[in-house]
Every structure is written in C-alpha cells, then in structure tokens.
Amino acid sequence: MIINNNISALNANRQLNLTGNSMTK
C-alpha cells in the first residue's frame, strides 16, 4: 500500500511539473 501511495504521489508531482513547464513556455 505504501508503495502504491508513493507512486501516486510521484505521478501527481510529475503531472504538476508538466503543467508548470507548459505554462512557463
């Protein structure tokens, strides 16, 4: 369960990074 939660958090962070990068461009 802990591993799945970490993966979900990583995916959420990556999604935020992608949206942030697209906004700065």
Swiss-Prot record:
Family from the record: Belongs to the bacterial flagellin family.
Entry keyword annotation includes Ion transport: no
GO annotation, cellular component aspect: periplasmic flagellum
Function: Component of the core of the flagella.
Principal location listed in the UniProt entry: periplasm
Location of the protein in the cell: Periplasmic flagellum; Periplasm
UniProt-recorded name of the protein: Flagellar filament core protein flaB3
Record keywords: Bacterial flagellum, Periplasm
